[in-house]
Amino acid sequence: MTGSMQSWCKTVCAAAVLLVGTVAPGAADLALAESSVVVLGAQTRAEHKQFVASFKQFLVEQEQGVQFFDIALGDDIGNTDGLKDIIRQNKVPLILTVGPEAFQSVLRQQAAPPLIAGLTYDAAELEKHPNATGVVLEYRVETQLAWIKRILPDFKTIGVLYNPEASGQRVAAAKKAATKLGLKFVAQEVNSPSELPVAMESLFRRVDVLWGLTDPVVLSRQTAKAILLTSFRNKVPFIAPSSAWVKAGALYSLEVAYSDIGVQTGEMARSVLRGKRVSSIAPQEPREVRYSLNLRTAEHMRLKFSGDVVSGAAQVFE
């Protein structure tokens, strides 16, 4: 056995968690069954654990004899020969990656096995690889705009700040979706965070609401305070990408249900284990939509939600 295989074996023996079946101590003796799933990625955060637990529970109930091999990126499996060895020396039926780092680690391997990406945002990247699919964490722009119309039915002009290089394609899709929904869409380019103050002042004079499209240039820890304060001062509601922003003063955000995403991803895995090609399974958005509301912000902006909107919220800050 090579040194790299011995190192990988130690990693697997230390990190593997089997819900069904047993693991032999030698990597060469793994002999992965047709119903084996290698789960690659860190599971330190609560939502990651919830996602993986839900994924496994679904498959255990659906697939008799399914086995899971958990490998954490913290064991440097993505930066050593370990991942190459398991792919080269074992016929891996399926890999589930947890998070974008794990996803990219598998894509860097030659002849990567069928892959389902969990907890990643990049649907476009998934679509580039015929041997990969998954459930992305972000809702399609069509879904997000439809929810703006549902929660704020009187707001007709939607504004967005975006970096053309990072988000140009999504903004183009959003413009088309807004037109179909009868909404006016105003997009303001931002090439660097330093341009945000002027861009916001210009945009806020022309829109009813600011939609927080996830964009690495526009939305970050460094820009959060300025965006929230400008929104509050101009009384233009900010629709945020997460409940953390809502707690800090944004009006609302759409949320994902990690347990449901685990089941949704598990359904994809079941199809692959039963013989369906990954290339025939299109990437999906989360099918369950949850949202958080900030009633303090709504009161400041003299907004009133319908009773159904308030009662339907997964989380309410007041």
Where are these regions (language model features)?
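Short hydrophobic alpha-helices and adjacent helix-cap/hinge residues
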Residues: 28-318
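Generic low-complexity, intrinsically disordered sequence content enriched
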Residues: 9, 22-23, 63, 87
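Low-complexity, intrinsically disordered/propeptide-like segments
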Residues: 8, 21-22, 33, 148
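C-terminal segment of classical bacterial N-terminal signal peptides
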Residues: 19-29
